[in-house]
Amino acid sequence: MPSRTADAVVIGAGVIGASIAYHLTHLGIRPLVVEEHDPAAGSSGACDGLVFLQSKKPGLHLKLALESRARFDSLREILGTGIEFRPTGGMCLVETEAELAAVRRFVVEQRATGLDVELLDGGEARRREPELSERVIAATYSPADAQVNPYGLTFAFLRAARAGGAQVLTGRPAVGIRVDRGRVEAVQLADGAVSTPVVINAAGARAAEVGRWVGLEIPITPRRGQILVTAAVPPLIRHCLISAQYVAAKFDPEIARRGMGFSVEQTDNGNLLIGSTREFVGFDRRTTLEGLRTIAARIAPVIPALKRVPVIRAFGGLRPYTPDGLPILGPVAGVEGFVMAAGHEGDGIALSAVTGELVADWVTTGRTQFPLGAFCLERFQAGAA
């Protein structure tokens, strides 16, 4: 490929990169998106579709999620019904007194942050979700929780981006970034260079590799999640569901080692997606019999009706994990024109809308409506507050 230029280059065509490309075109930027494989071939194509707010830490993380959720209603109109966005509401299921004590505090803090959420006793939880067993002693409920088709969302963002002037190259991996005097100059592909003043690292679980091309150490590591997919059945659950243990394990490694939470959603087609393991196994995305058995054994006592539903397949995906559970967003010190947009782990779908908007705003104006300081790469440096 001969040398060419682009207003900006987005590395990665998952849901984050696709959203960024779409939002850039709305601001007059015509980006080039480069993807080693196919769109949504990484985390975005191997995950559930939860736009779940109750799993977010009160404070900045939840505020970011609320901002993103607010944009999905309009995105449904703009991107079309193919994204399968459904505001089903969600429930976080409590099984122990220890979980209940933690959830009570969580609800107070989430309400203070702006989330519409309430605590239900076990009886009310079963009234709203009749298939829940007596094992569920309480639950929280939020009407803000929703679900979407991750593939549909990613491809809809890319279609809209192309319509706005973006180019998308698939099967064309970036292999390096050229920096001159501390400033991004070009992205190197296998068959040529693309001159550009801006490179956006939306490479998901492989974002650390991209960072090394410009001399950065980015603390993003892959964490595998395995998910079961059932046959299509008539409506079995009414909401998207997660366990309180899942929420706690997301932020507390000790709880994660003591057991596994779960998440359940039913798609438009009637299939149920049941997850998920959280495993540090490098870049191995294969499913394991042990992992799948663990998921099935974990969910069956909570929703006994699932014992009668056949599993038709399973998949594993790699989530881009950061040590503090927050994504890395925005510019980085020392490399002008290099912008981070990775590290969302299991929140990429939920945060995709606002991430794309914020990164596009920063690229075009150097400002954002939502402060990015808490999400900067420099927070991991020694001595950072």
Residues covered by each model-derived region:
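Beta1/beta-strand and adjacent pyrophosphate-binding region of the FAD-binding site
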Residues: 2-16, 32
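Active-site substrate-recognition segment that forms the wall
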Residues: 22-26, 49-52, 81-86, 176, ...
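Glycine-rich FAD pyrophosphate-binding loop
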Residues: 25-45
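Dinucleotide-binding Rossmann-like beta1-alpha1 core, especially the glycine-rich loop
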Residues: 48-128, 261, 290, 298-299
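Short beta-strand to alpha-helix junction loop
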Residues: 63, 93-102, 141-159, 169, ...
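Helical element adjacent to the flavin cofactor pocket in flavoenzyme catalytic cores
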Residues: 140-197
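C-terminal catalytic lobe of FAD-dependent flavoproteins
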Residues: 150, 284-385
